[in-house]
């Protein structure tokens, strides 16, 4: 049967309240969607973790009078009269198949492909990482992920050790291993990210070469030939003293999760320890790379 979709944009903090409001207004289901395609892992029991900028989408029966729905929502203290929203009529489709059909193998650099598990790899001789959207990296189109994957693809990682600082799903560590690294180390503050990385590594046959740690458990004397950190500008600046000691002398550093407008301040935090390359930009995001002095 056809459906009607109503979409609201809000903050992660307000998403639950607006979800309840949509349900009270007659929605049969609610979906939270990141406005900017940033990955979020399964929450811990009793915890709902959402993005800072979240779309709350309510699905309504096709017979619903949406004028009545809007009138109800206008009384909500977070919305008010004339609140911004988008209403769409959805066709009757096989939604699971429709969702899967939206995702295709993606190429990063010259050798590397990221492929959903239900798709055939486009090149058997390429470096293929099998990761599904959602658990792995949202839709996989976020510029910071792309920038990091392209950088790793450009390197000769043969027999190298790579640290993925803030590993999330493990996509960067796994890609490094598939690109020839002898060992990768993933570090993340989120136990759910550690589990996601472990599962993805097993799926790609590299779990025997991937070490995973929460910060409290990581070895004190830990070094790598290549360190990549795709987190955010604030933590990259604050953690610069810790991250800067991870590469060996002459080792490489790659940083992303940084808006282009934040590049200068992040560069300043690392300039004393690294010979930095020109900043590479993609859309509004950027990547900073350099070699350890």
From Swiss-Prot:
InterPro entries tied to this protein: Ribosomal_L11_MeTrfase_PrmA, Ribosomal_PrmA_MeTrfase, SAM-dependent_MTases_sf
Q: Name one GO cellular component term.
A: cytosol
Q: Name one GO molecular function term.
A: protein-lysine N-methyltransferase activity
Major subcellular site = cytoplasm
Decide whether keyword Lipid metabolism is in the record.
no
Q: Which family does it belong to?
A: Belongs to the methyltransferase superfamily. PrmA family.
* UniProt name for this protein: Ribosomal protein L11 methyltransferase
């Amino acid at each position: 049967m056809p459906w009607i979709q109503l979409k609201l944009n809000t903050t992660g903090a307000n998403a639950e309240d607006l979800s309840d409001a949509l349900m009270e207004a007659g929605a049969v289901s609610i979906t939270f969607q990141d406005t900017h395609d940033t990955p979020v892992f399964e929450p811990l029991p009793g915890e709902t973790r959402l993005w800072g900028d979240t779309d709350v989408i309510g699905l309504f029966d096709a017979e619903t009078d949406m004028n009545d729905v809007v009138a109800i929502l206008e009384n909500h203290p977070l919305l008010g009269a004339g609140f911004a929203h988008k209403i769409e009529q959805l066709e009757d489709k096989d939604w699971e198949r429709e969702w899967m059909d939206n995702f295709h193998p993606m190429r990063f650099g010259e050798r590397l492909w990221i492929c959903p598990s239900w798709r055939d790899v486009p090149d058997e001789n390429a470096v293929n990482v099998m990761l599904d959207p959602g658990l792995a990296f949202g839709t996989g189109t976020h510029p910071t992920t792309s920038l990091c994957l392209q950088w790793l693809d450009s390197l000769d990682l043969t027999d190298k050790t790579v640290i993925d600082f803030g590993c999330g799903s493990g996509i960067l560590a796994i890609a490094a291993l598939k690109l020839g690294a002898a060992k990768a180390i993933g570090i993340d503050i989120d136990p759910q990210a550690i589990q996601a990385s472990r599962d993805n590594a097993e799926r790609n046959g590299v779990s025997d070469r991937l070490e995973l740690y929460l910060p409290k458990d990581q070895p004190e004397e830990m070094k790598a030939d290549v360190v990549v950190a795709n987190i955010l500008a604030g933590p990259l600046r604050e953690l610069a003293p810790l991250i800067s000691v991870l590469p060996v002398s002459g080792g490489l550093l790659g940083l992303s999760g940084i808006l282009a407008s934040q590049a200068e301040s992040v560069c300043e935090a690392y300039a004393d320890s690294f010979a930095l390359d020109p900043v590479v930009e993609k859309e509004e995001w950027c990547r900073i790379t350099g070699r350890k002095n």
